[in-house]
């Protein structure tokens, strides 16, 4: 999969073909887009390349999803502000593949509509350069009086999303792919979070709701991997809520779960990547040598 989920300027559109062509020829499975112009351009020049719609396109309902399907999209990542009911409606109405965020950072502003980073830092979140301005401390005044000072609470910083308890609901809403936010995260974080969610998806598929239970050790592991001041279930069950915002000082020191980190490094990060292969060689005097190697999948 390739991410092209950024706004593409007019003068850049013509470079999109040469940018995608080598990846397309190498077997690219799908491309993720935000820009409507990029969507139509890719459908024209790479008609058999599946196109996924990024959350940055702010798909907030079934009507926009219908239009995107008519333009050739096969999968949509809805806006992160949608409820489970609204996500289910998109799937039921369009039959599109639906992919939703299940873990990681949440934006204070609407997905794909935020200008905060551009205005304050000169870096556009819609061009892949978000400075995460909402993570900074801010003063807040009401009727001329401070209700928050910079050194007190992070009033615009949202807690990270965590949906382990909602996996059955999410899968039953027609979601086919779980999206884990990993911007500027380490391989250790990626390995830890993905392996935990894989565990609970498999548990639900095997045992159903009756056998579904989340271990506290896994909740603790997710917080140990990254903690911005707690976790929430985002907008899946609540339209909005005070408990989604950090609203507290960052702790000066966090205990490190070194045992967990060592396990992840040993199991996923610092391992040699190998797969079994079979092969044959043909060598004859006066002729070019020939060697053929393949893996179990026939590659």
Predicted regions and their residues:
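Surface-exposed amphipathic alpha-helical tracts and adjacent flexible/coil segments at the periphery
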Residues: 1-2, 14-24, 33, 37, ...
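Short intrinsically disordered, low-complexity coil segments enriched in acidic
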Residues: 1-5, 9
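Short glycine-enriched loops at secondary-structure junctions
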Residues: 6, 34-38, 57-59
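Glycine-/small-residue-rich active-site loops that bind phosphorylated ligands and cofactors
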Residues: 8, 57-60, 82, 185
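Short active-site-adjacent helix-start/loop capping segments
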Residues: 8-12, 40-41
């Amino acid at each position: 999969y390739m991410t092209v989920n950024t706004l593409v300027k007019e003068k850049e559109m013509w470079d999109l073909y040469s940018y995608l062509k080598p990846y397309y020829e190498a077997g690219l499975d799908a491309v993720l887009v935000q820009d409507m112009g990029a969507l139509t351009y890719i459908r024209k020049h790479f008609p058999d390349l599946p196109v996924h719609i990024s959350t940055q396109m702010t798909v907030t309902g079934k009507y926009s999803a219908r239009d995107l399907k008519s333009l050739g999209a096969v999968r949509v990542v809805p806006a992160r502000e949608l409820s489970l009911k609204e996500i289910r409606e998109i799937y039921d109405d369009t039959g599109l593949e639906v992919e939703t965020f299940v873990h990681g950072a949440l934006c204070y502003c609407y997905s794909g509509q935020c200008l905060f980073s551009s205005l304050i830092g000169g870096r556009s979140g819609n061009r892949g350069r978000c400075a995460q301005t909402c993570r900074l401390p801010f003063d807040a005044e009401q009727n001329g009086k401070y209700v928050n000072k910079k050194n007190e609470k992070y009033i615009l910083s949202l807690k990270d999303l965590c949906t382990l308890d909602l996996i059955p609901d999410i899968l039953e809403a027609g979601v086919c792919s779980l999206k884990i936010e990993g911007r500027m995260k380490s391989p250790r974080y990626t390995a830890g979070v993905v392996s935990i969610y894989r565990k609970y998806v498999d548990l639900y598929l095997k045992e159903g709701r009756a056998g579904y239970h989340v271990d506290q050790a896994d909740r603790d592991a997710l917080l140990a991997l990254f903690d911005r001041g707690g976790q929430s279930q985002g907008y899946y069950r609540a339209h909005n809520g005070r408990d989604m915002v950090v609203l507290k000082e960052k702790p000066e020191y966090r205990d490190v779960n070194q045992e967990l980190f060592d396990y992840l490094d040993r199991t996923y990060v610092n391992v040699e990547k190998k797969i079994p292969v079979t092969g044959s060689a043909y060598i004859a005097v006066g002729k070019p040598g020939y060697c053929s190697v393949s893996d179990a999948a026939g590659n």
